[in-house]
């Protein structure tokens, strides 16, 4: 079963959007198999955003993600990575369609509510960074055969 990493960023946590976001993924039929509310260390933030290390906005990314609590999650289901990206909407909320998380709630590129893995490789790497194996549950919902 495909898994992805999603994170409600500090702006989403501060604006009380955790429940709204979780609800959207549950209603889509995806299964939450790991979740935690946490503060992010600078070390974890730098490792998470390592691919952007040479970009001018790297410091701002790290500062923002460490500025307040985040809600880190692991979701599973068929095509969860691609579907989650579509549900999130484009990175820039100006370009994000209404009905997407960013289109409905984000205020700027820098404060765009949510992060999601963009590929199976990213999902595996990010889940491993943010969660121990024991923190990701493995169970089958009885409704799964109808989704």
UniProtKB/Swiss-Prot annotation:
InterPro entries: NDK-like_dom (IPR034907), NDK-like_dom_sf (IPR036850), Nucleoside_diP_kinase (IPR001564), Nucleoside_diP_kinase_AS (IPR023005). Its cofactor is Mg(2+). GO terms for molecular function: ATP binding; metal ion binding; nucleoside diphosphate kinase activity. Keywords: ATP-binding, Cytoplasm, Kinase, Magnesium, Metal-binding, Nucleotide metabolism, Nucleotide-binding, Phosphoprotein, Transferase. It is an enzyme of class 2 (transferase). Homotetramer. This is Nucleoside diphosphate kinase. It comes from Brevibacillus brevis (strain 47 / JCM 6285 / NBRC 100599). The lineage of its organism: Bacteria, Bacillati, Bacillota, Bacilli, Bacillales.
């Amino acid at each position: 079963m495909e898994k992805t990493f999603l994170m409600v960023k500090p702006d989403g946590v501060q604006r009380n959007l955790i429940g709204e976001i979780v609800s959207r993924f549950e209603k889509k039929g995806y299964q939450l198999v790991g979740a935690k509310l946490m503060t992010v260390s600078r070390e974890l933030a730098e490792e998470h955003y390592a691919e952007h290390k040479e970009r001018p906005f790297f410091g701002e990314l790290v500062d923002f993600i460490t500025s307040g609590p985040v809600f880190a999650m692991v979701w599973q289901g068929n095509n969860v990575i691609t579907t989650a990206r579509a549900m999130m909407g484009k990175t820039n909320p100006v370009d994000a369609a209404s009905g997407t998380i960013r289109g409905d709630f984000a205020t700027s590129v820098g404060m765009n509510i949510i992060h999601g893995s963009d590929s199976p490789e990213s999902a595996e790497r990010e889940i491993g960074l943010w969660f121990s194996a024991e923190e990701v549950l493995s169970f089958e919902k009885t409704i799964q055969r109808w989704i």
